[in-house]
Structure formats: structure tokens, C-alpha cells
Amino acid sequence: MSEGFDGTENGGGGGGGGVGKEQDRFLPIANIGRIMRRAVPENGKIAKDSKESVQECVSEFISFITSEASDKCLKEKRKTINGDDLIWSMGTLGFEDYVEPLKLYLRLYRETEGDTKGSRASELPVKKDVVLNGDPGSSFEGM
């Protein structure tokens, strides 16, 4: 059994008052494993419990960031959380190092998808191959 975000145990047994199915609360373990494998050597192995721990941490992180963005939207009497709100909440919660790269990514995404709501993407020139922090592996190729 694993402990849920609210401190209650989630396990088999099915009662109706639980938080929901684990697969509904977590990103798919296969996706977590695929992302983790990018950070270890080719011959490296990742234990199942490591993937499960990261899966829980990722879900908690998403809830943490989204909750702050949701509070902001409530104060502004808006019903929809957008990418700008999530980036704002990351800066507010101490993840400032990610704010500028995420703003850049969001701008490029919006330009590619043709969605410029809430942004000034059309005012900024776009560079199609952008490299972040001098790391060619972190570029947005083909955008």
C-alpha cells in the first residue's frame, strides 16, 4: 500500500470514499521510466521502487504548482489555469531558475500552435533552434 497526498493509505479493497484509482492520480509508470532512462547510462538499470517514488514525487509537484496557480486564478476571478499561471506559480514557489526557459518554451509552443492568447508571442522574433544554458541537448529543434 502507498500513502496518498492526504496521508491516508491507498490500496486494494475498493471502498468508495478514497482519493481515486492510483492510475488516475499518477502519470503512467512507463512514461516515468522512459524519462528517467534519459538521465542514466545506456547500461544503467532503474529499480521499480525508484520509478514509483519519482512517480509520486512528480504527482505531488504537479499538485503543488497547480494549486498555487489555481489560487491565483481564483483571486483574479478566472476559471481557467493557463501556462502563464503555472510559470508564475513556479517563480513564486522558489523555482525561479525554470521561469525563463519555460517562458521561452511556452512562447515557441504558442507560435507553433497558432495560440497567442495571453501572450505577446507575435511581437517577439522567433529563433527556430534555441539552445538553453549552452546545452545543445536542450534545444527546441524543429519548432
UniProtKB/Swiss-Prot annotation:
Residues 9-20 have a biased composition (Gly residues). Its main location: nucleus. Residues 117-130 have a biased composition (Basic and acidic residues). Residues 1-23, 117-143 are annotated as: Disordered. GO terms for biological process: regulation of transcription by RNA polymerase II. Residues 54-65 are annotated as: Subunit association domain (SAD). Disulfide bonds: none annotated. Component of the NF-Y/HAP transcription factor complex. The NF-Y complex stimulates the transcription of various genes by recognizing and binding to a CCAAT motif in promoters. May regulate the expression of photosynthetic genes, and may be involved in chloroplast and amyloplast development. It is found in: Nucleus. This is Nuclear transcription factor Y subunit B-4. PANTHER family: CCAAT-BINDING TRANSCRIPTION FACTOR-RELATED, NUCLEAR TRANSCRIPTION FACTOR Y SUBUNIT B-4. It comes from Oryza sativa subsp. japonica (Rice). Heterotrimeric transcription factor composed of three components, NF-YA, NF-YB and NF-YC. NF-YB and NF-YC must interact and dimerize for NF-YA association and DNA binding. GO terms for cellular component: CCAAT-binding factor complex. SUPFAM superfamilies: Histone-fold (SSF47113). It comes from the Eukaryota. Belongs to the NFYB/HAP3 subunit family. Keywords: Activator, DNA-binding, Nucleus, Transcription, Transcription regulation. Residues 27-33 bind DNA. Ubiquitous. GO terms for molecular function: DNA-binding transcription activator activity, RNA polymerase II-specific; DNA-binding transcription factor activity, RNA polymerase II-specific; protein heterodimerization activity; sequence-specific DNA binding.
